[in-house]
From Swiss-Prot:
Keywords: ATP-binding, Glutamine amidotransferase, Ligase, Magnesium, Metal-binding, Nucleotide-binding, Pyrimidine biosynthesis. Pathway: Pyrimidine metabolism; CTP biosynthesis via de novo pathway; CTP from UDP: step 2/2. Residues 1-268 are annotated as: Amidoligase domain. NCBIfam families: PRK05380.1, PyrG. This is CTP synthase. One of its GO terms (molecular function) is glutaminase activity. ATP binds at S15, L16, G17, K18, G19, L20, D72. It comes from Chlamydia abortus (strain DSM 27085 / S26/3) (Chlamydophila abortus). InterPro entries: Class_I_gatase-like, CTP_synthase, CTP_synthase_N, GATASE, GATase1_CTP_Synthase, P-loop_NTPase.
Length: 537
């Protein structure tokens, strides 16, 4: 086999941080000079997470080629330089759909189609497709869910078969949770033992066990896990809960020397990993920064932090680059009192979303920011909020709205794209993926990007209505970014406002700790400037 494969499974409980672990491993292996590809296998039956409730699933991360994926791919992007595409993700829904299509097309020649071998063979094919597309030295495959879940069984069986065929080129990591019982005053290894037993009963013997814990595990505990899980004590690794930031994770794994252990077992010759730049950034995150701002994030999923995961991380990246700490206030736009908090903030960010709930509250927030000179950053739906508010209160189109919120509005300043009007199905009908955007010289965004054309990722159905663009321009709303191919409005700025910008795309999908997105940097800079004229109470 021309590549090595690392499989990452999880046990005991969900939400262990397998995605962060996989992303951190990718960073470490890249810093050792290896080319890495990544694949997330999700056992749920949805074809993709595009129509799943953000409260249940968190945000939907979009790739350049327009695939709606799990938020873990956002971690992969922010930590590493891996190429993420349609080959980087697969769900049970996709796997079953592929198999059923082949059966309908007669490709199984009348065979009885079963989970084994047809579903498992298709899972193996997905793994090989990812490798063929990316030509990596190492492919990291994260399996969602928890060992013992019935929906994970086909994926684990496929991995067992793959390891059997390519034993010398595969490495299996099982991640578990080792709880500390305060009443007993000790950690308990039994859940880890049972989880590994479940994995071994399927036929997968882990090459390493990665134990998540609240405090460092003693050598005695590691030896106990080694003995009862039948792995060498040198293959039992420990990561504790991070103190300050998720970006500490690669440094923890580096201290455990897990990447070196993996490369030696796989026979890979690598250079010593250099994390000096990462260490410097993390060290700054651990200490108070000289500047401080307050930001209000106005949305409708604010009770669930993962719903806006990439936005939160992008704010962290930009603020760190400016030696700034951010006190972030998640504000529910349905809360009748949220404006009281927003008035105290140095900036307001309205992220993407769908549906009418909370819509009017967001428009009120945009009006407050416009009238008081508070920096405002509208992303996707947040840009549409800006445009509708401007149309209502500056153009005096009292009933201006988006047809998503009011299909009978007399002034549809935001409307569905013509080519989508005839589509009925909800899934897969949006403008998805990376599109070019031409910037207007002399605009704020041109100064931030420093180039005439950019590529940004989209996920939306509605656009600024061409019929209202000239009116908006005449009243001071500049269209400073357009799609060269279709002339669609992609970026707006209010001419006489310190910093009020809306973008139809999702810049948060491109930000990294080591390379903050210029729009977020510009937004934080504007908020810092605004804060100098305020006194905190």
């Amino acid at each position: 086999m021309s590549f090595k494969c690392i499989f990452l499974t999880g046990g005991v409980v969900s939400s262990l941080g397998k995605g962060l672990t996989a992303a951190s491993l990718a960073l470490l292996l890249e810093r050792q000079g290896l080319k890495v590809a990544m694949l997330k296998l999700d056992p749920y039956l949805n074809v993709d997470p595009g129509t799943m409730n953000p409260y249940e699933h968190g945000e939907v991360y979009v790739t350049n080629d327009g695939i709606e994926t799990d938020l873990d791919l956002g971690h992969y992007h922010r930590f590493s330089s891996v190429n993420l595409s349609r080959y980087s993700t697969a769900t049970s829904g996709q796997i079953y759909a592929r198999v059923i299509k082949k059966e309908r097309d007669g490709l199984y020649l009348g065979s009885t189609v079963q989970v084994i071998p047809h579903i498992t063979n298709e899972i193996i094919e997905v793994i090989l497709e990812c490798a063929r597309e990316n030509h990596p030295d190492v492919l990291i495959v994260e399996i969602g869910g928890t060992v013992g879940d019935i929906e994970s069984l086909p994926f684990l069986e496929a991995i067992r078969q793959f390891r059997y065929e390519h034993a010398e080129d595969c490495f299996s990591i099982h991640m578990t949770y080792v709880p500390y019982l305060q009443a007993a005053g000790e950690v308990k290894t039994k859940p880890t033992q049972h989880s590994v037993q479940s994995l071994r009963s399927i036929g997968i013997i882990p090459d390493a066990i990665l134990c998540r814990s609240e405090a460092p595990l003693s050598s005695e505990v590691k030896k106990k896990i080694s003995l009862f899980c039948n792995v060498p004590s040198t293959a039992v690794f420990n990561v504790v809960d991070v103190e300050h930031s998720i970006y500490e994770m690669p440094l923890m794994l580096s201290q455990e020397k897990i990447s070196t252990f993996i490369t030696e077992k796989l026979g890979l010759f690598t250079k010593k990993e250099d994390l000096s730049d990462w260490e410097m950034l993390v060290e700054r995150l651990r200490h108070p920064l000289p500047n401080k701002i307050r930001l209000g994030l106005v949305g409708k999923y604010v009770q669930h932090k993962d719903a806006y995961k990439s936005v939160f991380e992008s704010i962290t990246h930009a603020a760190l680059s400016l030696n700034c700490s951010v006190e972030l206030f998640p504000l529910d736009s349905d809360d009748p009192h949220f404006l009281e908090t927003l008035e105290l903030c140095d900036g307001c960010l309205v992220p993407g979303g769908f549906g009418s709930r909370g819509w009017e509250g967001k428009i009120i927030a945009a009006k407050l920011c416009r009238e008081r000179g508070i920096p405002y950053f509208g992303i996707c739906l947040g840009m549409q909020v800006l445009v509708v508010e401007y149309a209502r209160h500056v153009l005096h189109l009292e009933h201006a709205n988006s047809t998503e919120m009011d299909k009978d509005t007399p002034d549809p300043v935001i409307c569905m794209l013509d080519w989508q009007a005839s589509l009925i199905a909800t899934g897969g009908t949006m403008r998805l993926g990376a599109y070019p955007c031409a910037l207007s010289p002399g605009s704020k965004v041109y100064a931030m990007y420093g180039q005439p054309e950019i590529m940004e990722r989209h996920r939306h159905r509605y656009e600024v209505n061409f019929n209202y663009i000239q009116q908006l321009k005449d009243h001071g709303l500049d269209i400073v970014g357009t799609c060269p191919e279709q002339g669609l409005c992609e970026i707006v700025e209010i001419k006489d406002h310190p910093w009020m910008i809306g973008v139809q795309f999702h810049p948060e999908f491109l930000s990294k700790l080591i390379k903050p997105h210029p729009l977020f940097v510009g937004f934080i800079e504007a908020a810092l400037l605004h804060s100098r004229n305020k006194t905190y109470v």
